[in-house]
Design a protein with these regions (language model features):
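Structural motif
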Residues: 64-74
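Conserved short "hinge" loops at termini or chain/domain junctions
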Residues: 1-66, 126-132
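Short loop/turn elements at secondary-structure junctions
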Residues: 77-132
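Non-catalytic, well-ordered alpha-helical scaffold segments
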Residues: 47, 73-77
Length: 132
């Protein structure tokens, strides 16, 4: 059995002062992650996720508790998707390929939740499509 050392709960300062901060405990409570990644990596992924989400909600004023919850949810799921991308690996065996495919499906599911949460936050419809 592998036991992870507890990760201290540090709050990650949002680069955008008008938007809420997100802590490591927020991330671990919101999405299914283990603590084996460590405080430094989790903090970095939260910060990268904040940058990604902040770019998508420019000029949006986040005031209410509902908006704060939705913002934190978007950041946490984006951070989880970034971690999932880092863990994506392929090898030449059948098991490695199926693990990689499962990770891709998980990553797409996490990003879908992010997109739905941002749509809810910005009062847009969820069924957006990208034109090629």
């Amino acid at each position: 059995m592998l036991l992870n050392a507890p990760v201290t709960d540090s709050e990650v300062q949002n680069p955008e002062p008008d938007y809420p901060n997100v802590s490591i405990n927020d991330l671990l409570a919101m999405v299914r992650l283990d603590q084996s990644k460590g405080e430094v990596l989790l903090t970095e992924k939260i910060l990268l996720a904040m940058d990604n989400i902040n770019d998508q909600v420019l000029l949006l004023k986040i005031d209410t508790e509902t908006q704060i919850r939705k913002y934190k949810r978007a950041v946490c799921y984006e951070a989880a998707a970034l971690i999932c991308e880092d863990n994506l690996d392929f090898d030449t065996t059948t098991n490695g390929q199926s693990r990689g495919e499962n990770q891709q499906a998980k990553m797409q599911s996490l990003r879908r939740i992010v997109n739905h949460t941002i749509a809810d936050l910005t009062n847009r419809k969820r069924n957006r499509v990208k034109l090629i």
